[in-house]
Swiss-Prot record:
Free-text function comment from the UniProt entry: Aldehyde decarbonylase involved in the conversion of aldehydes to alkanes. Core component of a very-long-chain alkane synthesis complex.
Membrane topology (UniProt): Multi-pass membrane protein
Species the sequence originates in: Oryza sativa subsp. japonica
Tissue-specificity statement: Expressed ubiquitously.
GO cellular component: endoplasmic reticulum membrane
GO biological process, one term: lipid biosynthetic process
Family note: Belongs to the sterol desaturase family.
Gene: GL1-9
Protein name: Very-long-chain aldehyde decarbonylase GL1-9
Record note on quaternary structure: Homodimer.
UniProt subcellular location: Endoplasmic reticulum membrane
Keyword terms, alphabetized: Endoplasmic reticulum, Lyase, Membrane, NADP, Transmembrane, Transmembrane helix
Length: 258
């Protein structure tokens, strides 16, 4: 039994809940990002954000909305093709759902690592497609899904669809998986190193790890996203870092390689 049962279908929730959650979670971060009490947790100063970022917030919002429109269309098609409206979907035991969840995480990580890395290595793709995401040199939460539309389709939307299909999860399980993936992705771009943050505590691949990738020195490292750093470690693209306190307040993710 889930709260939406009897009101909307699992397929509808799987399509729109992650989008709504994105704006709630990222919007919450955006509201507090420039509050003075949180200055001591920032990975970059306000001045750095204003000076280094090459795109304004309204353009970022428009870009994210466009990606989410495409994402919703693909999700509706995917559920329409894979769901049997005449059959009663029986949820597997929790242990099976947990296994499917883990499989989906590993599949999504694998897909995104290799596509992401190739977009950096292919000069044409980087210049014309992936560089749009790196206009945010100082990442912030709302910009987590700020991508070129083609990258958004290939990296995030197709990656999510493949994770769903390979794992064999039901539409209901996918609601929780895609919402979790959205929360993790937003948190990885939040630009704040917060105490008691569960994502930053449990995952080595977190906002500081991804911040290194957005720096010039780390742009060819730390491709892994959104969950683990497995592929970076296996294939030699892992860049370690020290998290140091800045004298003027806040933190800095300082790469350890020259």
């Amino acid at each position: 039994m889930v709260p939406w049962e009897g009101y909307v279908s699992d397929e509808t929730m799987g399509t729109f809940a992650p989008i709504a959650l994105y704006w709630v979670y990222a919007g919450g971060y955006q509201l507090v990002l420039h509050r003075r009490p949180l200055e001591r947790y920032r990975l970059h100063t306000r001045a750095e954000e204003e000076e280094k970022n090459l795109v304004a917030l309204p353009a970022v919002v428009r870009g994210v909305l466009l990606q989410q429109l495409v994402q919703a269309i693909v999700a509706m098609i995917l559920f329409m093709v894979t769901s049997d409206s005449s059959a009663v979907v029986v949820q597997p035991p929790i242990i099976i759902q947990a296994f499917q969840f883990l499989v989906a995480m590993l599949v999504m990580d694998s897909w995104q690592y290799f596509v992401h890395r190739y977009m950096h290595q292919n000069k044409f793709l980087y210049r014309h497609i992936h560089s749009q995401h790196h206009r945010l040199i100082v990442p912030y939460a709302i910009g987590a899904l700020y991508n070129h539309p083609l990258e958004g389709l290939l990296l995030d939307t197709v990656g999510g669809a493949i994770s769903f299909l390979v794992s064999g999860m039901t539409p209901r399980t996918s609601v929780f998986f895609f919402c979790f993936a959205v929360l993790k992705t937003v948190d990885d771009h939040c630009g704040l190193w917060l105490p008691y943050n569960i994502f930053q505590s449990l995952f080595q691949n977190n906002t500081a790890y991804h911040d290194v990738h957005h720096q010039l020195q780390g742009s060819k490292y730390n491709y892994s996203q959104p969950f683990f750093s497995i592929w970076d470690r296996i294939l030699g693209t892992h860049m370690p870092y020290n998290l140091v306190r800045r004298k003027e307040g806040g933190f800095e993710a300082r790469p350890l390689r020259d």
